[in-house]
Amino acid sequence: MPVLRLPKFGKPVKYAYITGRVRAMKTKLIPNEMYARMLNMDIPEIARYLEETQYKEEIDALAKDYSGAELIEHATFANLAKTYRKLLEVSIDEPQFLILEYLRRWDIWNIKTILRGKFYGASDSEIMKYIVPAGELDQEFLEGLAKKDSINDVITAFEGTDFAEALSKYDGKSLASVENALDKLYYFRMERAVGGTLSVGGGLLLKYVKREIDIRNLITLFRMNKAGIEASIVQENLIPGGKLSEELSRMAGQPYADFVRGLEGYPFWSAISDVATADLDSVSRIEARLKAYLIRYAWSLSNYHPLSILPVLGYIVTKETEVANIRKIVRGKEAGLPNELIEEQMVVA
């Protein structure tokens, strides 16, 4: 497995080609207004609608083996992986490097998915349903991991790699510490690699990533402060490297009402001010609002830098959100949830 690279691109990078490709790909995204219509469809109707979109190839190919919600889940993840691989294929030099560094989050997703599957005794075929080979770890390698007999066997497969230290946190009782360590590893590697390029493109991506870290930490604070978890434990779960890391760390363990009042005035406050109340029952609506804010932030940055990595990043996060929304709708319908409950968990930017 390759070690972390730190290239220093010395020449101006031409982003016209990759941003042009992304503009064309963006036109194929599902319009936001379609989500409301999908909420009023049954699962077979949703599948038929998706056959008329960029998901047609995957729906048709997988229909012989799956049906219903399972078909849609497989098809959307397969399409997501294909789309991200296409971005890597049509990019070169700095754009390709930055895209790959960002997409390494899917390596983390896949490792977590395999560990969880082994922890709960899932079969390798069940685990592979949720694998998205969109990062550096390829399908064959991931299938090999899914076939391992135990969590320890999976961990052993990463000896000598950047993942080894994070995976060593596994205590045999819970996956929480190792998952937290993997998340921190991703952002540490990301900041080190992207910051190491010393390029304008790397700097722009780093600016977004710092905001992403802040939003992830904010969601963690909402969940843990709402649950009354003590400050030291909350702080252990926060990811370093955000622009607001020190300020958010000081909010760990605060009484929930005080914590919410302390958020007023921050850039993200307007996105959540009407739902971040002291009597909040569920954090899911706040999480959806914050993720939508992050997408808008990515696109707003790209407006100032149209020939940069940012339009590509905006597309990447929007595409991921599209797949997540489709899956939430389908899972919710399969579980018989009311539309209102499904809708509040969806991210619409």
From Swiss-Prot:
Keywords tagged on the record: ATP synthesis, Cell membrane, Hydrogen ion transport, Ion transport, Membrane, Transport
InterPro entries: ATPase_csu/dsu_sf, ATPase_V0-cplx_csu, ATPase_V0-cplx_csu/dsu, V-ATPase_V0D/AC39_subunit, V-type_ATPase_csu/dsu, V-type_ATPase_csu/dsu_dom_3
Gene Ontology CC, one term: plasma membrane
GO biological process terms, semicolon-separated: proton motive force-driven plasma membrane ATP synthesis
Bilayer topology annotation: Peripheral membrane protein
Domain of life according to the entry: Archaea
GO molecular function, one term: ATP binding
UniProt subcellular location: Cell membrane
PANTHER family: V-TYPE ATP SYNTHASE SUBUNIT C
Purpose of the protein: Component of the A-type ATP synthase that produces ATP from ADP in the presence of a proton gradient across the membrane.
NCBIfam families, per database record: AhaC, PRK01198.1-4
Protein family (similarity comment): Belongs to the V-ATPase V0D/AC39 subunit family.
Subunit structure: Has multiple subunits with at least A(3), B(3), C, D, E, F, H, I and proteolipid K(x).
Record protein name field: A-type ATP synthase subunit C
Naturally occurring in which organism (per UniProt): Methanothrix thermoacetophila (strain DSM 6194 / JCM 14653 / NBRC 101360 / PT)
